[in-house]
Amino acid sequence: MIQKMEPAIAISLHYNALPDDGDAINTQGVAAFWYHSQAQNLAAFLHDYLVKKLDRPSYGVFWNNLALTRPTAAPSILLELGFMINPLEFEWITNPQAQQKLALALADGITEWFGQNREPIANNH
């Protein structure tokens, strides 16, 4: 669908989980995944923006060959916005006010990224 629609960017939003034997208490944070180099800047920027604006822990920014990061028509990233298996993060994930803040921060971050990465328009005069 991303290849067909050719959007300016593609962002897939998720909440993370761990295997049953994972460390639910000590694993937390926002993560971003990218595959093609054209998406690395977007992944790092939005990860850092959300961590800072929402005062959330960082899980990191990673290169990974995920289906939703492979399209080449646009910078395509996958964001993991927290760990559902972590009790404290689950409370944050399911809090309506936190969801609203997250949505606004994501929209603001995308807007700011576009502002910083706009291609100059050629002057044909």
Regions found by a protein language model. Give the residues of each.
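Active-site-proximal helix/loop segments of hydrolytic enzymes
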Residues: M1-H125
